[in-house]
């Protein structure tokens, strides 16, 4: 099984889960990621998917995770996202042949016009469908949590990690928690998302990989949508810290509601929002 983006957050967890089930794993990535996944793969190849040219390997299955994934930067740098997420996917499809191509996408692909990240991931879905007879399109929803071995970047953009970092800040005066947008047409004025633990996401990916190609979209995400205010409330409850919150203007590219439309038969929710908050608090200590 070939895994692209193997040293990243989701990719490294996938490699670990596959090896624990005795699969042979060929891991690829191209960055200076500080995560050592040598124990979670049988072979590692340093590959920049943006520069792949020609045919490389025939493998049984491919899990294509490599991508640029942040909404905000995609608004400012759309062509960088196109180069990696669309052109890079085209190169992977062309360079490797397989019996089942699993494309890791995003729930944002349901609304590709919302930002460049969503548009380019949707473009990758179209390429996968066009050039593979046997595929599975897997859409993730606001992945959070950790299993203890992954080292995140210092820059924090994820809501739950950002709240945990506020809680774990040194000193008695905790910095404020930014709240981007309080005037959305939602139940409390803030964005609603489906936060899903990395363990449940990866378990779903492994089930899909071990099954036959579905040739359809598989949505891996919690069926319960929660608002930004509700996440902040949960973090305060779990941590016991009533930290400061500062309402700010909306962020470019954010949409009001992104929820799971159809739950995949491969998804099993075992972890809660409270679990994700506890994981983040432990990591940010």
Report each predicted region and the residues it spans:
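N-terminal Rossmann NAD(P)H-binding glycine-rich loop of SDR-like oxidoreductase domains
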Residues: 2-20
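NAD(P)H-binding glycine-rich loop region in Rossmannoid oxidoreductase-like domains
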Residues: 49-84, 108-112
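Conserved Rossmann-fold NAD(P)-dependent oxidoreductase catalytic core, especially the SDR/UDP-sugar
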Residues: 64, 90-118, 134-136
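NAD(P)-cofactor binding segment of oxidoreductase domains
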Residues: 76-101, 126-127
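Active-site Tyr-X1-5-Lys
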Residues: 114-141, 161-172
């Amino acid at each position: 099984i070939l895994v692209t983006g193997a040293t990243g957050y989701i990719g490294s967890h996938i490699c670990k889960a596959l090896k624990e089930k005795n699969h042979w794993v060929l891991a690829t990535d191209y960055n200076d990621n500080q995560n050592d996944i040598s124990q979670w793969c049988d072979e590692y190849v340093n590959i920049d998917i943006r520069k792949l040219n020609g045919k490389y390997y025939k493998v049984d299955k491919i899990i294509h995770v490599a991508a640029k994934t942040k909404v905000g930067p995609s608004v400012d740098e759309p062509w960088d996202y196109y180069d990696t997420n669309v052109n890079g996917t085209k190169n992977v499809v062309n360079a490797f042949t397989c019996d089942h191509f699993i494309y890791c996408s995003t729930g944002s692909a349901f609304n590709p016009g919302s930002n460049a990240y969503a548009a380019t991931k949707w473009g990758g879905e179209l390429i996968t469908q066009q050039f593979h007879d046997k595929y599975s399109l897997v859409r993730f929803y606001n992945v959070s949590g950790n299993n203890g071995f992954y080292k995140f970047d210092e820059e924090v953009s994820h809501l739950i990690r950002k709240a945990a970092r506020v809680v774990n800040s040194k000193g008695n005066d905790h910095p404020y928690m930014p709240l981007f947008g309080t005037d959305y047409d939602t139940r409390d004025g803030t964005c609603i998302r489906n936060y899903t633990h990395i363990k449940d996401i990866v378990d779903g990916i492994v089930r899909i990989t071990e099954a036959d190609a579905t040739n359809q979209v598989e949505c891996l995400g919690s069926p319960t949508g929660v608002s930004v205010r509700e996440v902040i409330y949960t973090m305060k409850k779990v941590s016991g810290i009533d930290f400061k919150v500062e309402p700010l203007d909306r962020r470019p590219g954010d949409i009001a509601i992104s929820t799971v439309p159809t739950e995949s038969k491969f998804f099993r929710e075992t972890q809660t929002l409270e679990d994700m908050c506890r994981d983040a608090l432990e990591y940010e200590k």
